[in-house]
From Swiss-Prot:
PTM sites of type N6-(pyridoxal phosphate)lysine: K231
UniProt keyword list: Amino-acid biosynthesis, Aminotransferase, Histidine biosynthesis, Pyridoxal phosphate, Transferase
Taxonomic lineage from the root: Bacteria, Bacillati, Actinomycetota, Actinomycetes, Mycobacteriales
Entry protein name: Histidinol-phosphate aminotransferase
Family of the protein in this entry: Belongs to the class-II pyridoxal-phosphate-dependent aminotransferase family. Histidinol-phosphate aminotransferase subfamily.
Length: 379
């Protein structure tokens, strides 16, 4: 049998991976790309120059392994998160990896695995079940409210009855955008009988709610807060995620992480990006203002708009969401079909990109919407 004739069915793939689909946000060259929730504002010249100089300096050490524990980077992350949340954190509370997905993978390697379970409240981030499958952690799920927000009573009941080893709560939730109040997170934590709660705050810088980091001292053995530099930080190409937790959690991850997992170049570039945090995060207010403008315009056109606390908006209600996604693409606008019947998600871009999206939406509103569509939260 020639190599090009071999299929997955011919390979000794694990049974729990057969029939599954990989993560796949389309990467297409179109005029307007609003599908992966990146910060559309490019890095400043000062940041680019700092990254280039830092990487150049680090390159002189390419013949040596990097700092295995990334102490300097974690120290900088602790300083940033302390300033951002008002919660005093040290290097012992922070861990970093190649994007928050690697953070989540390491957490599941340490606290999930064969014979253990993880639960999420769907629809939510699609990588949570994929990472669970990859670590042979049984994936459980419970439903969200009609507006896709977290139904705290359902969540507490699910955690109490099913006793998962890992609980995922995304705040703000992707793809619906709602943040979870700290009091609701406390209810979930209080209901847990062992296990850990991972609060996924990938979009935390956009949120109107306080970070779950504020609860770490009260629940040191139960709570982990994961974050990323891929969204508000405009560092998606740099691939840097991190978490805040009790020092013992970091000790647990040391048992499963691969040695030297963060390259010397990644560490240098991320530290440079953190030095420009104030400048980069200055775009957050502008993106929030654009989010509100886009939401208001979609509502005016008759779309059902889910109120968002992130840098994206979930909207509908379409007769055939996949077909409507294609019509946006035909108009030169790439948005995201996240698999929720009747709904699509759009990333908030630059004003001109949002205008192009809205222009396409105005054309489609008369033909694509369900007759019963009524905007959520409309006055």
């Amino acid at each position: 049998m020639s190599a090009d004739k071999v299929t997955l069915a011919d390979l000794p793939l694990r049974d729990n991976l057969r029939g599954k689909s990989p993560y796949g946000a389309p990467q297409l060259q179109v005029p307007v790309r609003l599908n992966t929730n990146e910060n559309p504002h490019p890095p400043s010249k000062a940041l680019v120059d700092d990254v280039a100089a830092s990487v150049r300096e680090a390159a002189a050490e390419l013949h040596r392994y990097p700092d295995r524990d990334a102490v300097a980077l974690r120290t900088d992350l602790a300083a940033y998160l302390t300033a951002a949340t008002g919660v005093r954190l040290g290097v012992e509370n922070l861990w970093a990896a190649n994007g928050s997905n690697e953070i989540l993978q390491q957490l599941l390697q340490a606290f999930g695995g064969p014979g253990r379970t993880a639960i999420g409240f769907v629809p939510s981030y699609s990588m949570h079940p994929i990472i669970s499958d990859g670590t042979q952690t049984e994936w459980l799920q419970a439903s969200r409210a009609e507006d896709f927000g977290l139904d705290i009573d359902v969540a507490v009941s699910a955690v109490t009855e099913r006793k998962p080893d890992v609980v995922f709560v995304t705040s703000p939730n992707n793809p619906s955008g709602q943040s979870v109040p700290l009091d609701d997170l406390r209810r979930v934590l209080d209901a847990m009988q062992g296990g850990i709660l991972i609060v996924d705050e990938a979009y935390g810088e956009f949120s109107s709610q306080p970070s779950a980091v504020a609860l770490l001292d009260d629940y040191p053995a139960k709570l982990v807060v994961s974050r990323t530099m891929s969204k508000a930080f405009a560092f998606a190409g740099g691939r840097l995620g991190y978490l805040a937790a009790a020092p013992a959690v970091i000790d647990a991850l040391l048992l499963v992480r691969l040695p030297y997992h963060l390259s010397v170049l990644t560490q240098a570039a991320a530290r440079a990006a953190l030095r420009h945090a104030d400048d980069t995060l200055g775009s957050v207010k502008a993106l929030i203002a654009e989010r509100e403008r886009v939401s208001a315009e979609l509502t005016r056109m008759g779309y059902r708009v889910i109120p968002s606390d992130a840098n994206f908006v979930l909207f509908g209600a379409f007769t055939d969401a996949p077909a409507t996604w294609q019509r946006y693409l035909d108009a030169g606008v790439l948005i995201r079909d996240v698999g929720i019947p009747g709904h699509l998600r759009v990333t908030i871009g630059l004003a001109a990109e949002n205008d192009a999206f809205l222009a396409a939406g105005a054309e489609l509103a008369g033909t694509e919407l369900q007759p019963s569509t009524s905007p959520v939260g409309a006055q």
